[in-house]
Amino acid sequence: MTNEEKRLIADCRVMIIGALDFIDNVKAELYRSGFKSINIVSGNDVHTEIGTVDMVAEYVGAGRICIKEEVKIPIIYPFDFVNGAGAIVIMPGDDNELQHKDNLRLWVAEYMAGYCAFWNVEGCEWLQLALPAIRKAKTSDAAQRTAAHICARIAANIAVGRNVKHFPRFYLSKNLD
């Protein structure tokens, strides 16, 4: 990583929205990646104003999205899927149809599993096997740490101007532990 990229990451303002235990994981990964300006918002607060940040990382869990306005900054939605994790990015100008989904975590898990099955993507079997646990709203600490790591990597790439996959494309990984 160049000094300029390190500066861009340090100067980038990130807002994390979600459950406190998950926020702690994301915050730690963002700090490890070099982010300095991190704003924390409890997931219980429905947000109408984003404020002055450069991107948002919102952990939804089994609920609905807190940000209800059309935003002009990237939004990263990390998900813990018990045996692994995934993330979806909404970039400015993208249609954020995710705003209208109930139980977004389950919807995304089924979407990703269906995509992998349809396109015969190797290495996704763990997600299909995790769907019953996801339907029961089970989580795991390892999956939350993996989701936080994925989120921080995406945030760093956005901060330095690299292209990232955005919805309908996604990121998916087995647990790192």
What are these regions (language model features)?
Residues N25-S33:
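Rossmann-fold NAD(P)-dependent oxidoreductase module
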Residues F22:
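Hydrophobic/small residue at the entry helix of a nucleotide-binding pocket
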Residues G161-D177:
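A short, charged, Gly/Pro-tolerant segment at domain boundaries
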Residues M1-M15, R32-S33, D45, R169-F170:
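N-terminal charged helix/coil linker that caps or initiates catalytic domains
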Residues A19, S42-G43, D80:
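Cofactor-binding loop segments of dinucleotide-utilizing enzymes, especially the Rossmann-like FAD-
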Residues I50-T146, S173-L176:
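E1/E1-like adenylate-forming module used to activate ubiquitin-like modifiers
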Residues K36-H47:
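NAD(P)-binding Rossmann-fold cofactor-contacting core
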Residues H149-K165:
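Oxidoreductase and adenylate-handling cofactor-binding alpha/beta cores
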